[in-house]
Regions:
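Specific transmembrane helices
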Residues: 1-73, 84-100
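Cytosolic/stromal cytosol-facing helical appendages immediately following the last transmembrane segment
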Residues: 6-31, 37, 124-128, 170-288
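Membrane-embedded catalytic scaffold of the fatty acid hydroxylase/desaturase
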Residues: 53-54, 58-62, 81-232
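Beta-strand-enriched accessory nucleic-acid recognition/scaffold domains that flank the catalytic cores
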Residues: 76
Length: 288
């Protein structure tokens, strides 16, 4: 944190303002605290830590279920590629590819977005932002089942997941500008991930990769960091309560489903994009 503070203090402001931001700064935005590092805010950081603690508790509670599901899939594996020498490297690549699609669907399907919105809810972008982890990841664990079918053991599966999460921790910072071009071309970097957390129109639904950015380049979801990033949601939830951040969107979905006039609308409120509304031809997502 101190390193981030010193780096940000030295850095000059970017030349281009966020003229296309869709979540303009207002009186409700968090105010920096003089006694905490630059770029941090006490309530924002406390909310991030609360989400981390909840995520760890939920993870421990569901670990037995995850192991049983993996064991069943592993016994019915169609390949033993995961047992070969160097399997951890291939596991990391396979995990990252599946992570790209998992992450993308989290932004494109409202039910999955409800699982992910807490991570994007902060209007600060710093290392504590990476701690905003899901409490309902069970909704999308099926995305990674192919790894079990390919013959990756549960221990290898966990290592690939943990290394992916660890890599993504350091890219949640404004203190690192662009890295050398070869790195920016292949890997996810702080610059690329700042774009992903942006509420600017041009940054919405971009840069889903975990470790590698090549998936975004290949599937046409890549966007470079050009203008200053406006962090948060297009409609900020204005709370640092971990429970509200973790489950608030599920409550909103339930309210919309109850108020819907027909089955088709009810299903779309759950499975269409986050910003879907009845009779909307090309909806704007609530945030991606």
């Amino acid at each position: 944190m101190i390193w981030e503070h010193r780096t940000l203090k030295r850095r000059r402001l970017r030349d281009l303002p966020p003229v296309d931001a869709v979540a303009p700064i207002d009186d409700g935005d968090p105010v920096p605290d003089r006694l905490v590092p630059l770029g941090y805010e006490k309530k924002d950081t406390a909310g991030s830590l609360g989400l981390l603690v909840g995520s760890i508790v939920v993870g421990f509670a569901l670990d037995g279920l995850y192991r049983r599901v993996h064991g069943f899939m592993f016994r019915h594996r169609v390949s033993n590629i995961g047992s070969h020498r160097g399997s951890i490297l291939s596991a990391m690549i396979v995990w990252d590819f599946l992570y790209y699609w998992n992450h993308r669907w989290m932004h494109e399907v409202r039910l999955f977005w409800a699982d992910h919105v807490a991570h994007h809810s902060g209007r600060r972008y710093n290392l504590s932002t990476a701690l905003r982890q899901t409490w309902s990841g069970v909704l999308t664990t099926w995305v990674y089942w192919p790894m079990s079918l390919l013959g990756y053991r549960y221990s290898t599966f966990l290592k690939a997941r943990q290394l992916n999460l660890l890599y993504q921790y350091w890219i949640h910072t404004e203190a690192i500008d662009r890295l050398p071009e070869p790195i920016e071309k292949i890997f996810n970097t702080p610059s690329h991930h700042r774009v992903h957390h942006g509420a600017n129109k041009q940054y919405i639904d971009k840069n889903y990769g975990g470790i590698l950015i090549i998936w975004d380049r290949f599937f046409k979801t890549f966007e470079p960091e050009i203008r200053q990033v406006q962090y948060g949601l297009t409609k900020n939830i204005r709370t640092n309560n971990p429970v509200k951040m973790a489950y608030g969107e599920f409550v909103n979905i339930a309210k919309d489903v109850v108020s819907a006039d027909n089955l088709n609308d009810r299903l779309k409120y759950v499975f269409a994009g986050p910003g879907w509304q009845p009779d909307t031809i090309r909806p704007e997502p609530a945030f991606s």
